[in-house]
Amino acid sequence: MSMQTLQASEMRPLSKTSIVNVPIAVFLGLGALLSQSVQASTIEGINHTHWAINHFSVDGRSGIDIIGPYQGGGGGCCYIAPQRWQRGMTVRVDWETGVAYPDGFPGFADRPKYLAWRDEMRSHKRQHSKVVTVPDYTGQKVCGITVHFLPCDDIQVTTSCYAYGSPEYPIKTPLQLPEPQSCPK
């Protein structure tokens, strides 16, 4: 087998079509690779407690909304789920709870009374953080992530595209859960 060396005079310059097609092919290839690796969508929350969810985040990304007792909300962007679920996948959820409908607002005219009321309301705020497993979504479309806030500072998450309450939705927990007398430690 002989090796031939091309001489400069034997080389042909790239055509204009080739010069344009190479970057397009690279761009389309990267786009296909990225579309296979991630899916991004909203961060939602369902509150099953009598507390207000003042704010929450999933892996540092804000859920945006304040969620009242026994309500849903959110709409922050974006939870990015890998295309393929892997055993041991988790998310970290940080949230703050507080009094939903504070009683006894004294108004602003009597500043000492107002400040005492404000301090009382602030004393009920609690910061929470929990790492939870992302359920297996193999073979399913991923539509962001929904965090369910449960009594005893517990949470569940799902990536389901179905609406809460529909028969196909994976979390069947009733919206209005009774608060237990005490929570497990």
For the regions a protein language model found, what residue spans apply to each?
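N-terminal secretory signal peptides that target proteins for export/translocation
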Residues: 1-16
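Boundary at the C-terminal end of the N-terminal hydrophobic targeting segment
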Residues: 38-40
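Beta-strand secondary-structure signal
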Residues: 44, 92-94, 146
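Bacterial N-terminal signal peptides
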Residues: 21-32
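Tryptophan-paired
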Residues: 56-102
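Beta-strand-rich cores of mature extracytoplasmic or soluble domains
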Residues: 97-185
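Structural motif
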Residues: 43-51
